[in-house]
Every structure is written in structure tokens, then in C-alpha cells.
Amino acid sequence: MAKRKFSGLEITLIVLFVIVFIIAIALIAVLATKTPAVEEVNPSSSTPTTTSTTTSTSGSVSCPSELNEVVNERINCIPEQSPTQAICAQRNCCWRPWNNSDIPWCFFVDNHGYNVEGMTTTSTGLEARLNRKSTPTLFGNDINNVLLTTESQTANRLRFKLTDPNNKRYEVPHQFVTEFAGPAATETLYDVQVTENPFSIKVIRKSNNRILFDSSIGPLVYSDQYLQISTRLPSEYMYGFGEHVHKRFRHDLYWKTWPIFTRDQHTDDNNNNLYGHQTFFMCIEDTTGKSFGVFLMNSNAMEIFIQPTPIVTYRVIGGILDFYIFLGDTPEQVVQQYQELIGRPAMPAYWSLGFQLSRWNYNSLDVVKEVVRRNREALIPFDTQVSDIDYMEDKKDFTYDRVAYNGLPDFVQDLHDHGQKYVIILDPAISINRRASGEAYESYDRGNAQNVWVNESDGTTPIVGEVWPGDTVYPDFTSPNCIEWWANECNIFHQEVNYDGLWIDMNEVSSFVQGSNKGCNDNTLNYPPYIPDIVDKLMYSKTLCMDSVQYWGKQYDVHSLYGYSMAIATERAVERVFPNKRSFILTRSTFAGSGRHAAHWLGDNTATWEQMEWSITGMLEFGLFGMPLVGADICGFLAETTEELCRRWMQLGAFYPFSRNHNADGFEHQDPAFFGQDSLLVKSSRHYLNIRYTLLPFLYTLFYKAHAFGETVARPVLHEFYEDTNSWVEDREFLWGPALLITPVLTQGAETVSAYIPDAVWYDYETGAKRPWRKQRVEMSLPADKIGLHLRGGYIIPIQQPAVTTTASRMNPLGLIIALNDDNTAVGDFFWDDGETKDTVQNDNYILYTFAVSNNNLNITCTHELYSEGTTLAFQTIKILGVTETVTQVTVAENNQSMSTHSNFTYDPSNQVLLIENLNFNLGRNFRVQWDQTFLESEKITCYPDADIATQEKCTQRGCIWDTNTVNPRAPECYFPKTDNPYSVSSTQYSPTGITADLQLNPTRTRITLPSEPITNLRVEVKYHKNDMVQFKIFDPQNKRYEVPVPLDIPATPTSTQENRLYDVEIKENPFGIQIRRRSTGKVIWDSCLPGFAFNDQFIQISTRLPSEYIYGFGEAEHTAFKRDLNWHTWGMFTRDQPPGYKLNSYGFHPYYMALEDEGNAHGVLLLNSNAMDVTFMPTPALTYRVIGGILDFYMFLGPTPEVATQQYHEVIGHPVMPPYWSLGFQLCRYGYRNTSEIIELYEGMVAADIPYDVQYTDIDYMERQLDFTIDENFRELPQFVDRIRGEGMRYIIILDPAISGNETRPYPAFDRGEAKDVFVKWPNTSDICWAKVWPDLPNITIDESLTEDEAVNASRAHAAFPDFFRNSTAEWWTREILDFYNNYMKFDGLWIDMNEPSSFVNGTTTNVCRNTELNYPPYFPELTKRTDGLHFRTMCMETEHILSDGSSVLHYDVHNLYGWSQAKPTYDALQKTTGKRGIVISRSTYPTAGRWAGHWLGDNYARWDNMDKSIIGMMEFSLFGISYTGADICGFFNDSEYHLCTRWTQLGAFYPFARNHNIQFTRRQDPVSWNQTFVEMTRNVLNIRYTLLPYFYTQLHEIHAHGGTVIRPLMHEFFDDRTTWDIFLQFLWGPAFMVTPVLEPYTTVVRGYVPNARWFDYHTGEDIGIRGQVQDLTLLMNAINLHVRGGHILPCQEPARTTFLSRQKYMKLIVAADDNHMAQGSLFWDDGDTIDTYERDLYLSVQFNLNKTTLTSTLLKTGYINKTEIRLGYVHVWGIGNTLINEVNLMYNEINYPLIFNQTQAQEILNIDLTAHEVTLDDPIEISWS
């Protein structure tokens, strides 16, 4: 709590006093030195030099020669004021001014001090009689005879004291330290040397003769009110003294004065004496850890002066000099010895280690209740609510405000009911005034009656001061009467308010008046001759007069013991209030030994970043002082905090031993929940407090060790790593015990910390991953919600499942975290008792365990079991960090019984963590756990993926491991050693937007030789583009390599924020790898820390672990399932004119996958690389990329659901194109139409059969000799036919191939203009076209159709040139040719671009010989079709040149896979420019982003049953790839289809987005009218269903065009929580609501389908099928397909017709499928179906539909397109409405109510509503209700 605020007058007087004081000091300095006020600077240097200015001797003083003097050894002879030569002479000291005023100008020489007159040995040590030298006095009343007594108390503890043998002087009446009776210890670690003239004492470590304490550096001064002694120290590394704000844990030795005298003074950046009186310090001597400590048992005011030598000078104004010296082999031992002397810390109550909330001045109990409520709601672990003085009536102890805090006892009971505690503040000052009601203040009256107050100097009159209640008296807690009174008052009040602990404040002791309300007497106690450098330089400032009297003595002597004595008295009170319970005492003022009785907080700090940092030093110092239960006010007490500061402070404060958030009156609340339930601060606080509560068993065990052995809890790094001098100065991080390293962020805006990592194995606490750092400073990335937590290898940590209170958490299962050391060992221990009973250790009522790991064995040994209640708890989980090999078996045993297998374990290879669960090891017994490790076969990564067969010789020559003893025949026999790590990380830079790391090839590690030459220097760049998207890229920073010229939609600068990112990225160093972790689960979702990483010029390889076996994507290739098979299958990717087949690389190139995570999340990964590659899937699970060029450029999308991850990917590559409405109609095509008449015959047959049919195609046979932009003589009537059908509402699409003939004998404008515009691909550095042969035939020859393809190529194919679509000029040329053909030859509505892999019928060029072997036959050839035939097989030569839009050139080797992509946009742009309409482009070859402009069909499939299910897989994959308008050739392209197959395929194809029946020449016709009437009727029926649903389908296509995502949707995208759906691929969804379950096997009328967990309706009947969450046999007729509508959705529909042109004029209808709650919703997107960019230009109608029980409404979201004839609502079908009889249905439309015609089928819960009698259009809102 803060002090009272000063009045304006007081502030004015203080300011004036300070000004006068400063002027006086300046004048004294100038007069004393007679030197200029401005220091002269040597003109040759800007740095002032330090030199002596005068030399003076006074009287008979013999000053040291200037030449030999060490100025840093000067001991100040005038410490009380600025020195003058006159005073110096008067004191007979040496006067030698210096131009640095920090250095004493007047200093002692050897003429001062004492001589030894006699020395004797005693039973405890020795005694020496000292006589004072005849020298002038400093402050009068010198004591001439002094007695030195030494006591060798233990082998490592020496006491020596200097007393007045003739007069009893005040000595500290310590309540634990007792007099030593002897005998003297033998075999001590120290020697004591006493020098006789002048007297000095040295303490020497025997083992190395190091002098630890040496008072010969200065004289002993011993007078009545001034005692001085100095000692030279052997080390510059000293720690301790208090209480002050020490900005650094290690003391600054540069002439620092630290006063010690308890004072109510808030913390600040100065040397003010604060609340406590701590006179212990410690020094570390050397890297062996040897250390010593010094304690002065003295409670009088003093100051400690530290100077650089180093020298410590004590200036004490009373008592005696009573020193204890402690020698230890380590710093920790020294602290233990000190605490053994003063009393080890109390064992805290377990609940007091929980988080506490407090505030000075909540103002009312209602506010406190709200604070408690909101933090409970935020699930903040929170044990204790604390009340400051505002709960009291008029600030009076033992009262509460019955107005503002009315109901306080009930509130406390509510806390208890929730397992929480209540702590109240008590100040020592007791009001002398009556209660607010006028009643007597009984606590005061009872105290008066028992004479318990501190008295004035007369010893009988209570001294009266002023504190919070006004005029007050002060209990004398040193008096037995007072202790009894205090205990009684606490007990009485506890009966009124059932508090659980006490916070004692203001006990320095503090008063708001100087001394008393009478002032203070003018005497040497109130005004001593020397006043240390205390605040205000006034002894009784803010406290009592120094001549006031207590039971232990004068206030002058015992002032600094007030808080100590109050803590002891409060402990007695607690014993009475809580018999046999520990309770909790928190004190502000402390003395040596206070930790036996109370905890401590660091006082009234300020909400600044500096004070948060300084709190660590304060905490560590109080650990030295024996008060381990310590912490600072989290978020700051004074001043307004900020969210960032408070968040960071909450992170740090979660690891204070005493963790309390507390602030002052007048400032905003700062409890965590105040910042908002979903704030980053709340999330971070909850997270780290949960970790604190998880670790409480470990923390509690540390407190047990502090209580039993004096060990530190919050531990300086140097205590554990003393052999490393870097640790001696580390104070921005600290340890819990020996094992948990805590690294907070202490700087505003920082997200990285320069952290020193000591020499040990360290594991990230949150992930369990081993860190590569050791004995080095690192830039640790600590984003906004993170603090550094690292577990030290070699230690075992007990944990417990957390809860929101310790009451609850103590009942939860226990566990262990084992952090293995380098030698795979670890040790630990665990203490457990009931958490609250007093003296359980002393009474043996506890459980104690030791843990030890070695050789994969964990021994859990109970060494003490006398707490039977604790045996109900059990160790349930054991997490072992650093398990380097896969664990194959875990066995367990109890009490030396035989081992049994335990199957419940998982091994995380990314983090090398073994997690063993469900153990049920009850406390009180011994257990053993063993785990077996092996390098699993499934972990092997092939080292010889080459085209030739691996042999042992080739394998070993490469540097890899050969092993033919494989269990799985697919496992590689040649594989990488686990230690393979060719690149080392030379530097890593973290920034708020990403990471940059440099890699260097390490020749000593590069023993494996892979294809091509390795690149020496690499750079890794990580960019946090979005909260859900991260890019990571590896490239050569010194030589520009090819990068994919495909633009992505990514932010120009990263937009992610640290607090909202879904991921964390880390560069691992040994081995190098990139790890990406999902924050929400901690799951590693990318982990390339696997062997085999290579970055060679033409061979790049990287592997990553996968988070599960569920991975989807990569293409284009024919897959047998949607989920990839991870059994060492390799799939090549390189665009090729290759009909689909197993493991055959086909038309497209999509290096994208989506992976599912076991925890129920999904993510996607794109490798932006267009070079040939292959990917191997391994059962690890893992995958390996092998790429033969470019760079590694990955993009990850974090989802977290499959659909969201897909949308995120599409946002980057571009949302799918919006097709025209007509393109959703049924389409017919055939390669092999002989003439126009055949097409006309087909068309007329379809029309006559009334089969829905929108689009007719022609393949290349319409062209003259397969030349683009020509029409063959056999098709001369085709333009007229196209005009005819277009006039009837149909559409026409033509095919265009890229290859342009160059052998024409007559002008061929397409080639001629192309050559003129230089559009064709050429050989590099020449103007020569690289000729190919494709479809175009030579002119003037007769085609022999009996020839094979290869024979025909030689006989009749023309030389053809490939347009270079990367060139700007090519797009212009292509547009002109398309426009010219449209205007001058034939109209069309869409374009089908084929053969654009690009495909050639020769290898590379017409000679089949290319010019660059290295490119066409690269050192590594991916696993592609025709693997040994070269990359140029059936395509262009790899060395041919393309020109990008920026004019730069690239090789076909790099951009081959982009050829189809490069053609797509120019074609789409040309189509729209030509037709002025949206149109559709269908492309065979695709690359990421192509879906923005084109659809895709799945290529030249086969008329086989197995090609049907593969078409579903292909559609779902292309949905992932961002190409939603997809489908397969219905009934198959190759081979003769057959009736049953074509029937089922037509039923399936009716629900392809792109529904086209297409086959090849010389096979039978397979169009619907080519079969029989039954087939015709089946086709008509199923296509009528399609056309009915087109508004719904069109709306879904709009949704993914606007937002990304899937139209053909895998079931798992909607039912991700149902893992059964993760394997389903024989069914699919249209959007979220329409499920298709086709028949994919011959001659069956039963299909086995999965019905996800939702309400489903049979589309054909409208009935609820009553099945969910199970596999079901679905029966159907030959002419039908299973279709189901999902409850909760509304599907807009339209009456079907033969074309979409006609259907769009029919009535709309709605299918309303209610969910279990009779709710549903849906939407309609509607435009004219053909205009370009209607969504982007707001030219559309958008309607939202909602069903709420018995009311259906529509809401208009956009009205940019209205055509009332297209949007007439005619029918509504409501399914699943319940079987309540409906009597009426009403329509509210245009504010008029209409009764409607309806039909209800009660049993089937169907309501059919007819609106055709009313002109209802959807451009106005509707409301339909029934009752």
C-alpha cells in the first residue's frame, strides 16, 4: 500500500529545501577545492583524465606517495559531509583532492584504529583486548577498550564480534540465534589472523590461502554512536544487502552507498533505504564455485559503502560489531549455512502458492465480487482474494465497513465454497478514536488495559503518531503482553470474518508525522552525531521518535526489528486462530530470520518496465536472505499499467514464488479479466498460471527443501552454473530450483530476448523439444503471449493436472516430467503432505519420493510414507524429454514385482518426447518403468531414390547405410544415417515479422554424396504473412536461382500480429530444420529436422514429419484413394500428356497437400516450385520432396479446419473462376465426329428425347488438318449449326491446341502473324524456333488412319511451333487469332485448351535430339513415367528459352510445368474480350492459380468401373487445388463403354460440376440417345434432378468464387470431428448440404455408404432416413442414385427444362430441410448467368432464407440484379417439420397476408406449399408461417 499523499504546502517546502541544499553543496565543493567549477579537458582527447590536483599532509600524518597510492583503496575519513581540508586536518587524516568527487579526498592512513594489547585462546576461539590509538575523534564518545571475541562455531562458520568490555551495549535479541557455548570446531575451512598494530582481522580459506575478510584496509572506529570497519574482498562479484532497489543482482562497486534502516519508502531508481533491514552479502570467489558470505548481526541504522577495490565499509550508529563468516564450496551452500544460523524459512501453506488478487481501494464489496466473478469466468487459476485497508471501518484494524462491505462474511463463505481463500491486511497502528457509531473501539481499549503500546521516552506514556485511521498508538510486539493481546484480537475478529491469512503492512514502523504528534526530544538518539545516508537524513522521519521505548529496548536500537517482531507476534496469533495450521503471513518489513515466520513482497513498486526488471533482483536477494516466498506487485502498484506491460508482468509473475497482482487506489483495475475475456492478456495469463499450477508440486517440493535444508527456491543462475563466469552477472532470468529456467520479456515492444543459456541440456517446457543452445547467448523469440520456460536436462519434475484453485488441483492426478541429460540420466524428488498442517516435516507426517533414470529405466522410490491420506493420489502420466529413438515398448512394475507391458504410450519424434499415460501409480509405493528404443524401419529415408537399382556398393559409396533385413518389402535398403546434418546454422535473426537464418555447408559433416553440386551458403527466410499463413523459403543468397513467376495474393507487408498468430516457427540447429507448431495444441505440424536435407544445384531434397497419417493432395496423378498411402510410395510430378494411370504423372502440377492433425485440426502446405519433382510418403509419417531446380518456397495455411485451410490457400492462389450458369448444364462431345451431320443427328436426338442438354463440343476433328483457327471441309456447315443451337438457347465450345503448324504451303495467318510478333519458343541465344510435331498434319497428303501414332508422326505430321504464352506479345497474338476466328468463321461460347503440358509427338524436337544433356538428363531424374527417356520425352527440349513479361529469360527446364498455366489467362481474357460474356475455359494442364481462369477435366480416362471412383478422388483433389469446375469424361474416353457402366456413370456425372460425356474415335457412341429408351429415361430423370438443383449448385460456386473453398466437398470438410469421414472418398457433398452416394460397382442395387452425424432426408422422397453416424446399406433401383439433403439447410431450386435458358424461366422452389430443432438456413445467389464479374460489380441478387420452427423468412442482402421472370417462387417443400397437424399456411408478402394451398404428409413430416397462385418473386421479402 502507498503512503499518505503530501499536501501542496509540504511539496513546496520540500522543493525549496532541495534547491537550497544543492546550492550549498556546490558552494562547499567550489570553496573546498579552489578549482574551477568547469573541469578542464585536455584538447587532445575528448575523455577527461583522472589525476591528483594537490597533495597535502596534516600534522604528523604520513600520506602514501602519489606514485604508489591506489586511489580505489582510500577509506573516507569524512563520510558525513563534503570534505574540507580543515576538517581533514582536524581528524588527522590525509588530504589529497582528486578531480573525481566519488573518490575520497580525505582518507585514513594507518595512524587511526586500535592496537592489540593481549590475545588469549578460549574454548570457542580467541579473545583479544584492543586499545584505541591516540588520534582525533570522528564523532565523539570513542570507546578506548574493545574486546575481540572469535568463535569457530562450525567447520564453515566463524563468528567474531567487537564489544565494549566495560559497558554492556545493545545487542540484537534475535529469537532464533543463540549464544555459542563451544567447544570450537576443529578441521575448519578457515584460519583467523589477527594483526596487532594496528589491529586488523583476516579470515583465510585454508585450501587456497585466499583472504576472504581483511579489515587491514581501513581502521576500526568504535565509539558510542559510530562504529566503522572495512574489509577488502577477494572478488568483484558480491550480492546481497537490503532492502533497496538494486538494478542488478551483482553489486555495482563504483563508490556506492547503501543505507540500511527500515522505512516506509516506495521503490525507485535511487539508493533509498526501504522496508527491510538485511545485512548479509555473499561473494563468489572463483569458477570452482567456492563462495563465502558475511552477516552483520546489528539492527541499528547503518550504511554500507562499496568501492571498486572491492572494499566494503560498514558505518553503524549503535550496538556492536557482530560478524558471521560462512564458507561454502558453492553459492548455494553459503546461503544454506546462513539460513541455518538465522532460521530456515517456514513451510508455506500449499494454497498460498496459488495466484492472489488484491487492490488498494476496491471501494465496495460489490466491486470485489465483480472482480472475483469475472476472473472465475475467465477461468483464471486464482486461489486467494486479498483485501487492503478499504474493507475496514475508518481504516481501523479488527473492523469491517458494514456499509461498503456489507455481507463480507457471506462473501468469504462463497470464496470458501469455491475452494478459495481470503486474506486481510492488518496495520500495526491502532486508532485512539471511537468507532464510527460512537461506540468504544474495543481493540484499543483492551490494548490500553494491558499496556501493550510503544511508549515515549518516559517508558509509561504511549507514543501517539498518525497513520491511516488518524491518531494512533503502536503495539510493542516485543512485549509478551502485546503478543497475547494481538493474538486475542486476531482471534476475536476471525470469529466475525472467517479470513485465512494475514497481511501485515506499515510495520517499518510507519507514521505520517515525524516522530510523534508532539515531535521528538532534542537528544543524541533522535539527532545522533552521525546519520547514515537514509531517506530525509532524519532518524525519525516517517516513523517514531528514536528515544521511544519498547520491551526490547530503545527505538534507536530496535526500530528495524519492528516488522520482525510483528511477524513473530502474528505467527503466535495464527497459532491461536488456526490451531495446528500454517495459514499465511505476508510482511513488508523484514530482518534476518523473518522468513521463519512470514512471506514478503517487494513493496510499493511502480508500473514501469524497469521496475518489473528490477523485481527479479529483489526476489533473488530475498532468496539469499532466507525469505523464498517473495514476489513483487504484478503489473505494478503505483501508476497506470498498460496491457502490454501487465501481460508481460503476468507472465513473469506466474513464476514469482509469491504471485499476487496488486495495485493502488486511483488507478485502473488490472486483474487479468479486466482486460477482457478474450484478450491476449487473459489467454496468456491463464496459460501460464495453468503452467504454474501444473508445477506446484515441484514448487512445493522446493519450499520443502528450503524449509528443511535452506535451499533457494527462485535461484540465481550462478548458484547452479558457478563454473561459468557469464552466469555471475545474469539477473534478467532465473531458475526455479536447479531445473526450470525462466526467461521473461522485460522490454517494451520486444518479442526477442538476448538470453544467456547456461552449460546444460535444455528443453522447451511447452513443447518438450530439446534446444540446441548451450553456454551461449541467443536471441530467444518470445512473442507477445510467451515467456521463456526451459527444463534442464538431468532433472525430474513432479507435476499435477491444474485447476482453477489448489483446492481442486490437489485432488487431480500427478505426473512426472523427465528431462534427460546427455547421458540419458535424470534425478528428482517430490514432497507431499496435506498442504496446511503445521510442522508436518518435524512430525514426519508426509510422503517423500526420489526419482532416478538411467539406461531407459525409471525408479520411483518412496523414501518416507507417513501421510496415509496422500496415498489416494497417483502418478498418472510420465513425460520423458530427449528420447532420441522411437520407443517400441513400455513395461512397468510395482515393488520389485515382474515387469508387465503398458500399452498406453505415444512417442513424438519431432520433439523426441515419450508420453506414458494411465499409469495409476498410487503414492506410498515404489515403481519401476522401462522403455525400449529402436531406430524403426518406418523412420528410414531412402538415400538412393535414383532410377537405377540400389546396391550395397552404390549405397556405401554414397555414404549411406545398407540393410537388407527389412520387414516391410517397400522399406528402403539404402537409407540416411540419423546423424546426417550437412548444414550448420551460422546465425539466426528473429523479428516481429519473421526469421532469417544463414546456413553453411559443413564439410566435416558432408560425408554423403548426392547428385549434383551442393550449394555452400543458404539463407532461410520465414515470413509471418498472416495469422493463419506463414511462408518459409530456402535459397542461395549469393547467386540468383530461378523462382516461380506466378503471382500470389499475399500482403505486401506481413499483417499478422504476435498475439493472434496460430503458429510458432523455430529454426532448429542440430540438426538443421524448420519446425512449425500450432499454438493451440502445441502440435508440430512441420518438422524438417530429418536426415537427408540437400540443396544441390540440380537436386534439392527436404523431408518433413507429418502430424498424422492423414494427408491429401499432390497431383496431377491417378490416386486409388483420397488419402495418400504412406507405405514408401513415390509420386512424380511433371506435366505430361499421359492418360491417368497408377503412379503416372499426368497433365497438371500441384505440389500442395492438406494434412489432418490428430487433435482435430487441419493445415495446408504449398511448395511454390515448378521444376520436376517427386514426393515420397513414408509410414513415419513423413514425406520427402526431391526437386531438380529452383528453390524451396513453402506456404503453410493453418486452418484450423479442412475447409478453412482450403479457403486460406485459395485466398493466396486466387478464388476459383465463376462459371456461367449455362456451363452447369449437361454437355456432349466426342473425338471422332466425321462431319457436321453427325453432330446434328446427335443434337436432334437429344432434343427429341427431351434430355436436358446445354453445350455441344467438337474436338480437333472440326479443324482442317488439326490446325487451330480453321474449319475442315467436312464441317463447313458447322458455323450455321452453331448459330442454330445458340439461337435456341444452347452453347458451343471449341477446342484449341497450342501447337501451330509451320509447314503450310499457303498463308496460315496464325503462324504468319505469330512469327511476325515473335511469339514462338526458341532455342536459347538464337532466333531459331524449336520445332515439334503434334496434331497438325502436313498439307496436301492423304491421311492413313490405319497407321500407328508414331508412324503417323513420321508420315504426316507437320513441324509445329509452340507459342510462348509467357510473352506479352503472345497474349496479344492469341487474342487476335481467337477474335478473328469468332468474327470471321464461327461463334463459340467457351474454349477448351488441350495438349498444353505441352505435348509433343516427338522427343524434344523433330530430330529427337536436344542440345543440353545436363538439362534433359539431369543428375537426378524424378520418379516419372518413362523415367530413363529424359525430361524431353514427348515435350519440348528443356534448354529452350521463354521470355517472361518483364523481359527476363527462363529455361523450359524451369517453367515446363507452367505452360498450361501460362496459356489459361490469355485464353480466358481473349474469350471474354471476344464474346463480351463470361464464358468458360477448360484446360487440361494446370498449376496453382489456374483455377482463377479455367476449369479442368480429369483427362483421357478409361471406360472402366475403377475410373469412376477415381473421378471422385480427382474432383475432390482439384477442389483442394482451387479448381472447382471439374469433372471426368462421363462413361470413359478410351475403350468401348458398356450399358451398365455408362448408366451408373451418367448418374454420377450428373453431379460433376463439369458434366460432359466424351469419348474417343473408333469406339462406340456413348451419348444418352445411343443406348435404349430405358437409358434415355434414366438420363432424363437424373439430369432433371441436376437442373432442379442448379440454383443451389450455382450459389455454391459463387460462394467459393467469393470466399474460396470446395464445391465438391469431402465429407470430412463438414464433419471433421468425425474421424470416420477422414477415410471416405466414395461419397461426396455438393457444398455443405447435398450428399451424393453413387454406385461404383457393377450389377448391384445396394451401395454401402456412411451417414454422417446429422439429420438426413432422402432427396427422392423427402423423408428423414433416421440414420446418423453409421455405415448403412443403401438400396436403390438401377435407374436411380442415392441423394440426401442435410437437415438445417435450405436449397434454392428451379423447375427443370431442356436447357438452362428455358429452366431459368421456370418457377423457383425451396427445399427446406429442418434440423432437430426445426431450424434451417440457406441462400441464393442469382445474376444473369453470363455477364462478366457480376459479383465484383454488385450486379446480382442475394437472398438469405431462414426457418425458425414454423416460420420461413427471406432477407434481401443484395438487389443488384432483378429479373422477375427468373425468380418467381412457386413451391416450398418443408421436410422434417414434425407430425403435428397443420391447419393453415399463410404468406406475408408486400405487407399483405395470403392463405396458401398446401399439402401435408404427417407420417413423413412433409409439408408442400404451392405459391403459384400468387406472383411471388424473391426480390421482395417473404414470410411463410404455418400453424
UniProtKB/Swiss-Prot annotation:
It comes from the Eukaryota. Residues 110-1007 are annotated as: Isomaltase. Residues 61-110, 932-978 form the P-type domain. InterPro entries: Gal_mutarotase_sf_dom, Glyco_hydro_31_AS, Glyco_hydro_31_C, Glyco_hydro_31_CS, Glyco_hydro_31_N_dom, Glyco_hydro_31_TIM, Glyco_hydro_b, Glycoside_hydrolase_SF. The active site is at D505 (nucleophile), D604 (for isomaltase activity), D1394 (nucleophile), E1397 (for sucrase activity), D1500 (proton donor). It is an enzyme of class 3 (hydrolase). Signal peptide: none annotated. Disulfide bonds join C63-C94, C77-C93, C88-C106, C520-C545, C635-C646. GO terms for biological process: carbohydrate metabolic process. It catalyses: Hydrolysis of sucrose and maltose by an alpha-D-glucosidase-type action; Hydrolysis of (1->6)-alpha-D-glucosidic linkages in some oligosaccharides produced from starch and glycogen by alpha-amylase, and in isomaltose. The resulting sucrase and isomaltase subunits stay associated with one another in a complex by non-covalent linkages. Belongs to the glycosyl hydrolase 31 family. There is a high degree of homology between the isomaltase and sucrase portions (41% of amino acid identity) indicating that this protein is evolved by partial gene duplication. This is Sucrase-isomaltase, intestinal. It comes from Oryctolagus cuniculus (Rabbit).
